[in-house]
UniProtKB/Swiss-Prot annotation:
Any Pfam family matching the protein: UPF0227
Highest rank taxon of the organism: Bacteria
Family: Belongs to the UPF0227 family.
Coiled-coil parts of chain: none
InterPro entries tied to this protein: AB_hydrolase_fold, UPF0227, UPF0227/Esterase_YqiA
Classification lineage: Bacteria, Pseudomonadati, Pseudomonadota, Gammaproteobacteria, Enterobacterales
Protein name per Swiss-Prot or TrEMBL: UPF0227 protein YcfP
The organism of origin for this protein: Escherichia fergusonii (strain ATCC 35469 / DSM 13698 / CCUG 18766 / IAM 14443 / JCM 21226 / LMG 7866 / NBRC 102419 / NCTC 12128 / CDC 0568-73)
Length: 180
């Protein structure tokens, strides 16, 4: 089972495309939708939905995957639910760059302080990070600098922020999932 979390643009047709691409790894891909506008509510909702899916799950190596803001959530929810994560261009600093787009961007900073201390150290090697060199929305190098101590970083030379085509990375993701 692969759980997919969309980014800020929840209505993007690219979400359906990524789900279809992920089905080459596992036919059981589940999209969880969330508001993107209310961080504390989103965290509660995502934890509840992922936990529900894991309770009914028969796959002993589930994976959670997210793009952009979905990558922010996939890393945290995956850690809290003890499943491996794959994140594409994760928005690591939504409290800085979501100003004017969501109601309370400061809630992201609050969530970060309430998360487990040094959670990335405890999550070491359980998250695969795929970054685009042509991300027009976020500073990929800043993300790499933040994450490379804990996770493997894979650089993509073609895609932009929304990462329309993930197919060149499917074999790597599949191998990462099987490590479980």
């Amino acid at each position: 089972m692969i759980i997919y979390l969309h980014g800020f643009d929840s209505n993007s047709p690219g979400n359906h495309e990524k789900v279809l691409q992920l089905q080459f790894i596992d036919p059981d891909v589940r999209l969880i939708s969330y508001s993107t506008r209310h961080p504390k509510h989103d965290m509660q909702h995502l934890l509840k939905e992922v936990d529900k899916m894991l309770q009914l799950n028969v796959d002993d190596r589930p994976l959670i995957c997210g793009v952009g803001l979905g990558g922010y959530w996939a890393e945290r929810i995956g850690f809290l639910c003890d499943i491996r994560q794959v994140v594409f261009n994760p928005n690591l600093f939504p409290y800085e760059n979501m100003e004017g787009k969501i109601d309370r961007p400061e809630e992201y900073a609050d969530i970060a302080t309430k998360c487990v201390t040094n959670f990335r150290e405890k999550n070491r090697d359980r998250c695969l990070v795929i970054l685009s060199r042509h991300d027009e929305a976020l500073n990929s190098q800043r993300s790499a600098d933040e994450l490379h101590h804990f996770y493997e970083i894979v650089w993509d030379e073609e895609q932009t922020h929304k990462f329309k085509n993930i197919s060149p990375h499917l074999q790597r993701i599949k191998a990462f999932k099987t490590l479980g």
